[in-house]
Structures are given as C-alpha cells and as structure tokens.
Amino acid sequence: MLHVSDLMREMKCDCFCWNSAHNSLHQESFYKMDCPFSDLWRNYLNANECGLGHSMDSNEQSLKLLEENEVVCFARFEYKECRTKIPYLKKLENGYMAVYPHLSAYPKENEALIMKVNQMILSHCGVDIVENRIVYLNKEYVRQDALDLNELLCISDKLFNKRNHLSKTIAECMEEVDVDLDGWIERTKEILNRPSVTPVRTKQCTALRRCNYYSVCFNESNEPDDSILFFTTNQHKLDAYDRGIRHIHELPLNQIEGFRLQYAQYMASKTQKPFMDRAALQVWMKQIKYPISYLDFEWDTFAVPPYMNMKPFDVLCFQYSLHVETSDGNLTHYNFFESKDCRRHFIEQLIKDLPKAGTILVYNMEGAEKLRLKQLASQFEEYREELESICSRMIDLSKPFEAGLYYNSKMRGHYSLKSILPVFSKDVSYHDLDIQNGLNAVFAYRTYDEKDEEEKKDVKEAISTYCQMDTYAEYVVYHGLIKEVEKDA
C-alpha cells in the first residue's frame, strides 16, 4: 500500500522516496500551534457538522459518507493500492468541490499536481471533482484581542506564482499537468519494494536546503577537510568528484567561478593552512568598539498569531544571552528566559542589560536577531527608537567567514557558529550540553508550560546554558580572529 505523498517523493529522488518509507525520521513541526490547523479551517468553512473520514476507510465507506452528507472532511480513496485523503469535499449540482487548506501564505502553482492526481483517483472511484479551492493564511493580518478567522484565512481558486502573486487559476494549472498515473504508481511501488537503493549525488540533494536523508545516503566523515564536495556554490564539484578529484585545489582553475569565498577555500586547500585576508580583517575589526556585547536570541515561530499585534509566521523571542566585555577584559553574563507572551518584558530587560554604547556582535544577525528587533519595534511603537538604536550598533560576526576573509579547511564548507568554534578552541564545545542546537532549544521550550516546577527549572537551565554557550562562542571566535591577525604580523 502506498500514498499519494509517496508519488510526490518519487518525483524528487528514488532514495528520498525509499528512505521516507523505510527510514522514517521523526520531525517536530517548524511552527508552534496552540490548536490544530484543521480546527481553524473547519471553523472558517463551517465544516464542524459534517461527515468525517477515518484512516482505514474503504472506497465504499467514503462513498457512503458522500451520499449521506453535503460536506465530508478527510475522505479516503484508493486506486491501484494508492491511497489519498481529501481535506474537504462539498457536494455541488454537477459534482464536488475540493478544498485544500495550506499552513502557508503562498501555496504555489506546483500544488496543482497533487490536485490533478487526487482528481484522477477520485474519478476512478466514481467521484467527479469539478472545482478546486485553496485556503491559506493572510500574511498581512494583524491580530487584535481575539483571533478573527475571516481575516486570518483566505479562500481562492488561484495559486501563487514564484513572485508570490495570485496568477493562474487552479483549473489552468491543472490543465498544464500531464500525468501517467498508472505508470507513476507502478514505478513508485517498484522503488518501495526494493531491498535497498543506491544513492546518487545530484545538485537536488542540497538545493534550497540539504535533504534530511543526506547523511543517511552519504557518509562524508572520511572525506578530507578540503574535499571538493565542500567547495561552496561550485557547479562543477559533483562532476569533478565523479572524475576522481578529491581536493579543492585539484579542480582546474577554469572551473572555479571566482567568488571571494571560493578563493579563500582554494588557497586554504592549496597551502594546507588557514587563509586570511589580514588587511581586510583589520579594516573590519577597526569598527568594533568597547564595551563589546555578544548577543544571541532564541525564539519560536507561530504560523497563527497567538498574541495582539502579531502577524502569521511572526516569532516570539523567549530567551536571550548577553556577554558584555569591557576594555580591561572583564566579561559579564546576562540572561533572560520567560514563556508565554513575554515580549514587553524581553524588550525592557534587553534595553536595561545592554550597555548604552559600544559594539553589539551578533552571529548571522540580518535574518535573525536584527530582524527580531525590527518586528518587536513594529509591535511596540513606544520602544521603536531604542530598538532601532540597538540595531544600528550591531555588527555581524559571520561576515568575515561568509565573505572569505578567513577560512580554515577544518570548517569543511560550513559557516555556522558551531562549525567555526572548534577552529579556535578545543576546550569550548557544545557536545556535553543537554541541548546542543537551536531547534532542540525551541522544542524544549514548547513543553515548558506543561512541566511541574522542578522540571521547569531543568528545562530553563538547559536552554539558558545552551544560549549562553552561543554568546561565549562568539567571544571565543572574535578573540580567535584577533590572535590570527596578530600572529606573524
């Protein structure tokens, strides 16, 4: 037995399809939801009093539900051992309307493929879908005291293009899709029935973001630190690896695009020592003024805004760690942790703890801490001036690495703080922490309010210790760069 989702995975990669069925990975939701999304869209569509399908329903049971109800949610159907579930079916004079709710602000035109497949499967079962709709989140909705579903959710017969504009109708998109359903089902069955699959590296393995099964398919632990596989944004590296090239410096120069970061990697590989643009690093360091504040936030993302003045997919900061270093080398730590709607207290405590002058060093700030403060400024206008002042003093500690001013092959093509820390310190490490990455911190935070007081204390300590490690790592990395610049100067 397979599901329509298996067909979609087959489109991506044989290994992804097979691993999803045989090596399923537990994944926490990226978004925090205070209630199931299905509760919200069913209320929006007035579908609380309707027929409900169940996981093992046969075609006959689903057809009976449709016969007895004007609206059926979660109806199951099967064709050639391929099952599917339709979120919402409404009876019309000439057939049925299917509605597909998306926990997204911009359901894309490629969603028409699964709608076409579902339409074909239901057609084989004697159910004619004549209209399709999507329900999606209104990105511009700003919550007031109560959640307004009529403002939060939208319904449309169109899908979004790559520029996030409603463009073609669902019907037009479906007309452009050509599906050999029988062949697709048989091909997917054949893949899933194999005892194993042989992985093949392609650009799709790391496109947009690395596949969850990448480390399952490819063990790169034995690759050299300067492996050609770690050559950032190089379009020839996979072909080169297949030809037997193992080190970055072995790649012909005419196959190197010439980005600054690539040059840093190439030189580190060629010389077998760290590459450093000393002059550029010195210029970058001159802008950093004492006292230096090393800052890091932890936050959770809410698809549906839980509190006033929040929008869909806004975040809520629940933790910060702050190390403040004075010119005489003294290092002081400040910490904040709260649950629920702690935004105002977060802002007030941060303003209080941060020095009024000096540089604020943040790792990868533009899409993280700086963006978080801008969002808070829009939610709490009375603090806008102070928050914007904080943003103006921020300097991104990741820039020297991302811009190729410093590269050590031990980084193995990675530029996260955790990847860079071991380059500058063997003693400071995340390995012994109960929480070792930001996602684990978020998932621990989500359970915080459900714990008893003793457990809450443990969760708070684990999250705070992890966040404190981030800011101390920033301190270690910055001073590591200083030592590199001063070495043999």
Where are these regions (language model features)?
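Conserved DEDDh/DEDDy metal-dependent 3′-5′ exonuclease domain
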Residues: V71-A75, R83-K90, A98-A105, E109-L181, ...
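Helix-loop elements that line ligand-binding/catalytic pockets
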Residues: T198-E250, S339-R343, L350, E388
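Metal-dependent nuclease catalytic cores that hydrolyze phosphodiester bonds in DNA/RNA
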Residues: M1-N94, Q235-T271
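Acidic, Mg2+-coordinating catalytic module of metal-dependent nucleases/exonucleases
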Residues: K162-E223, I420, S425-A489
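Two-metal-ion RNase H-like nuclease active-site motif
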Residues: N69-F77, P291-T301, D396
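Conserved RNase H-like, two-metal-ion catalytic cores of nucleic-acid enzymes
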Residues: A98-Y100, A280-K356, F380
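Short helix/loop capping segments that flank catalytic or ligand/cofactor-binding pockets
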Residues: N19, N219-S221, A240, H249, ...
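Long, highly charged low-complexity segments
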Residues: E250-F297, F302-V304
